[in-house]
From Swiss-Prot:
A Pfam family the protein falls into: IDEAL
Gene3D superfamilies assigned: Uncharacterised family UPF0302, N-terminal domain (3.40.1530.30), Virus Scaffolding Protein, Chain A (4.10.810.10)
Protein name: UPF0302 protein lin2035
Similarity field: Belongs to the UPF0302 family.
NCBIfam families attached to this UniProt entry: PRK03636.1
Species of origin: Listeria innocua serovar 6a (strain ATCC BAA-680 / CLIP 11262)
SMART domains, alphabetized: IDEAL (SM00914)
InterPro entries: IDEAL_dom, UPF0302, UPF0302_N, UPF0302_N_sf, Virus_scaffolding_prot_C
Amino acid sequence: MKASISIDEKKDFIRWFLNKHQMKTREAMWVLNYIAGHDQIVKYVHFVDNLEGCARGLSLSAHGVESEPFLFFKGSIMTTDPEKAFHDIRLNWDEELYVELHFEEAMTSPEYALVREDNPFAAVKLAEEEKEMADALIYQSVHQFSREKLLQQIDEALDTRDEATFHKLVRILQQMDTEKE
């Protein structure tokens, strides 16, 4: 997650985007211009790669990509009517609005990268290999911690000259080391 993106950076991006890309619907351009013209709204706008899990979102497409031209949703209500979206954005200016933009070379655009944020609601999907690596790391950490604790107890047994405890702990340590191999 990157540091907070300033209002000016978001406004500059919207202006750049509208100058560089032609929207599939002119209403999408109007909505973006309206947002850019109101700092109090821009403050609550977040540009994300997908709208999964977001309570309120706007998906807009420029020419050159295969995506719906205009989608707005709030909760379980979804609409392609820009006027309803505009009305909601205007009235609920202080609610978080997640915006997903579809345009050519979006993922390689440095301008978009500057304002793009991680979707805080998107489920994190780990590949099987990543899960196995995480499990191995956890196992190794627990094993290392247990071994260090056991070595401390062995040192204490030596310091107190407790031969029975010392031998018992050494056997546990040897068994632990054998199991790890």
